[in-house]
Amino acid sequence: MKGFAMAERNPLIIMAAGKGSRMKASADVPEWVLEEAASRPKAMIRIGQDRKPLLQHLVERAKEEGLRDICIVVAEHDEITRPHFDALRPDGIDLSFVVQTIPPGRTKPAGTAQAVQLALEAHPHWDGSSVTVANGDNLPPSGMFQAMLANPACLPAFDRDHLGLPADRVQAFAVISRNDQGGLERIDEKPDEATIQSAIWPDGTVRVSMNYFRVPYGDLLEAVRTVPEHPVRKEKELPVALSNWSEGHPDGLHVLPLAGAFLDLTHPQDIVKAGERLDQGGFELRI
């Protein structure tokens, strides 16, 4: 697997434009946590004893596991992320940034699929490589990126009972079903209980998407360019683009069953918990 990884460019797009709208005030956390959540992009919240941003941990993890050409998508008016990495000057990787602006006539960006489209169009030299897409506000178990590099097109499907996250949060995660050939059958967003029951795997697990996947450059670019806006939210959504592409390429997206816990920043309490877990050594992948 490692030889395969090092033989390719292995580009990575990290979605880091989230503002952390659910980082509301809470009496259960110290004041410094609330200040951190209110003053920084969610991916740049500092955790652990070394006070290193979560996004920096993610970039370092990706580099260690063979992804050396990294593009970070940041929000308009983000004055923290790029200056941090410019000062850091991480070696051994090609690090670039794309800004997702708010189009005229809108109050928010045009969606996650549009963010990926911007990153792809800014890197035409990636054509011919498979592109990994990552979520900037959580940290996967170590080994996940390397496991993904063995497949030109894959979607990790994590056992939801071993994510290390609160059950009420996990309950809302998109569930993944795969066919007998190991390809993606469907992704069900915000599943109800009946949908969850229908998605139980033969081994008794329910497996969910953590918003990481890998698809060849040309296929991914076509998928995000052609996905329609959601009729209500008026956004071009990445899960829809991925599902649409998969429907047109039967067995094209390999579902990779994995297990392991994530560090996730959704609520202020997560900042303290993630830091404590990181100081203890983080999490390992189980395949």
Sequence positions of predicted segments:
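Short beta-strand-to-loop acidic/aromatic patch adjacent to the donor-nucleotide binding site
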Residues: 128-139
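Conserved core of the sugar-phosphate nucleotidyltransferase
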Residues: 139-223
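A short acidic, often aromatic-flanked loop/helix-cap motif at beta-alpha or helix-coil junctions
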Residues: 101-108, 162-164, 194-195, 261-264
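Conserved alpha/beta core of the MobA/IspD/sugar-nucleotide pyrophosphorylase nucleotidyltransferase superfamily
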Residues: 4-12, 187-287
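Active-site glycine-centered loops adjacent to acidic/histidine catalytic or metal-binding residues
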Residues: 18, 137, 159, 267
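A structural signal for short hydrophobic beta-strand segments in well-ordered beta-sheet cores
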Residues: 44, 175-178, 255
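Conserved N-terminal catalytic core of the sugar/cofactor nucleotidyltransferase
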Residues: 2-14, 22-28, 32-35, 48-130
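Phosphate- and divalent-cation-binding pockets in alpha/beta enzyme and binding domains
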Residues: 80-83, 143, 241, 273
